[in-house]
Amino acid sequence: MRQNPDIEISLVGEEATIDLGAKLALNLRAGDCISLIGDLGAGKTTLSRGLIQAILGADTEVPSPTYTIVQTYETDPAPIWHFDLYRIESPHELIELGFEDAEDDIMVIEWPENAGSLLPSQRLIVELIFTDNGRSARLTGTTPEWKQRLNDIFDRS
């Protein structure tokens, strides 16, 4: 059963997806997990790029980790682990990649459903959906803290 999103916003153009990533970046803390859900081409890597470049600068190269599975970035307050689990066939593969080591840092996970039971339960879920006008993003916090942070980010109470 799908939970109703806390926030739903329209993303018209690639820049809007990058801007959403940048907004989320300003509120990240050590131990955070953001799971990105969406079809191929929905904007998961674009959102990740916006998030990482908002912290490290627009010149920072942020490639898709489709083939490397994970890219890490040294940031303050904690390193960011950008995972793309599209090619993962079993959650056991993630243990070899240090997935559990990343839980105290910041995790941004594309194709999180492939993590199985290793996926942290306390996370922000960002679902990117194709629409007639481009894309939309549905953001759902799995904890009261995430719900409050979403309200703060988007000036809602």
Q: Where do the language-model regions lie?
A:
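The conserved Walker
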Residues: 40
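Conserved nucleotide-sensing/catalytic segment adjacent to the nucleotide-binding pocket
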Residues: 62, 66, 70-113
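N-terminal pre-Walker A segment at the start of P-loop NTPase domains
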Residues: 2-21
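Short phosphate-coordinating micro-motif centered on Lys-Gly-acidic
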Residues: 7, 90, 97-157
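Hydrophobic anchor at the beta1->P-loop junction of P-loop NTPases
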Residues: 34-36
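Conserved lysine of the Walker
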Residues: 44
